[in-house]
Amino acid sequence: MFSLENVCAVKREGAPLAIHPAKVKLCTGAVPGSAGRMTRWPLPAPMALALDQARLAAAEGEVPIGAVIVKDGAVIATGRNAPRAHHDPTAHAEIEAIRTAAASLRNERLDGCELWVTLEPCAMCAGAIVHARIARLYYAAADPKGGAVEHGARVFDQPQCLHRPQVYAGIGEAEASELLRGFFRARR
């Protein structure tokens, strides 16, 4: 099983690397190299797969967001944004992946599962993560306007939140951000 506990050695400016498990553990996707340069490490396979799902969403005219659910080191579900295709405003990548994983496991609780997603989840998706009991959330790009993990509603920080996954941010951030920027640039 992939774990970032010993990998994340760099902190984002002004933010601690590791805080309370309910808070975000920030990773930049790079580690200090020689002569002060930053050396990138390869993307973890689940995030690379989530980025592939995001590219598929973009090719289908959807906002390029992809998600992957892993249990015991194996991918059990993938999802990508599909609100337009499904005529369903709830068809976000995370929700699509959670639905597939729950059906695959024949259980609404996804205990021990990891969710890898290319963008910080919105309030709806963060709520679904809570209800599904996802153990760990890894996301690439922050979403200051619509995110609800480290921005906005901060769902996992609310006293009413009954389950708080471990959260890791910034893994594949550059790739996910560029994919989103390119998609919206082409739309303008």
PLM features per residue range, with description:
Residues 2-5, 13, 23:
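Charged/polar low-complexity intrinsically disordered segments
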Residues 7-9, 21, 28:
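Short hydrophobic alpha-helical segments enriched in small aliphatic residues
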Residues 65-73:
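Short beta-strand scaffold segments in enzyme catalytic cores
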Residues 71-72, 99, 111:
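A cytosolic small-molecule/anion-sensing beta-strand core signal
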Residues 23-60, 108, 121-188:
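Zinc-dependent deaminase
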Residues 85-95:
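A short, polar/charged loop-to-alpha-helix boundary motif
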Residues 107-119:
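Immediate flanking context of iron-sulfur cluster ligation sites
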Residues 76-83:
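Short beta->alpha transition motifs characteristic of CBS
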